[in-house]
Amino acid sequence: MRPCVFLLLSLGMLGAGDGSLDRATLHGVTSMNVVIDRLDPELEKAGITQDLLRSRVAGRLSMAGITVDPAALEFVGLRIDSFLARKGPASLSLSLAFFQPVLLVRDQKVRTASPTWEVSTILMVAPRPLVQSTMDAADQLADQFVSAFRSVNPK
């Protein structure tokens, strides 16, 4: 039996969170951090770690000439929600977003980080290629970000 990966939905390809207004919020950004949300311990047992994902996403950004700076206030955040069945395929939802500091108009003492650009994808994957399929999906999302970033910040 051949392992197979099913791409159920790629919201990034539909343009959700990657429209012209979303891309405009990336204009003028000079550097960014890379943050990986806490992962399900089962994903870590399978070999998918925050460090592996962080280095993978940061590497894609660096290869595209985007400065990765751990001290930057702006950051690219990757979130993975998962359901790992004991038998059968795993279900993964990956979301990559760009977060920037924002102030509330009505109360400028309130500061927070908010996503201003985002793409997502959902996978169903057999257990054997789980790590590689997850890395490939993270690469695709990072590449979508690079494309969006470069569309408003040409080299």
Task: Enumerate the language-model features and the residues they cover.
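Sec-dependent signal peptide recognition
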Residues: 1-7
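C-terminal/domain-edge helix-coil "capping" segments
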Residues: 17-24, 103-155
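Surface-exposed short loop/turn segments
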Residues: 64-67, 72-132
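Arginine residue identity/basic-tract feature
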Residues: 2, 23, 38, 54-56, ...
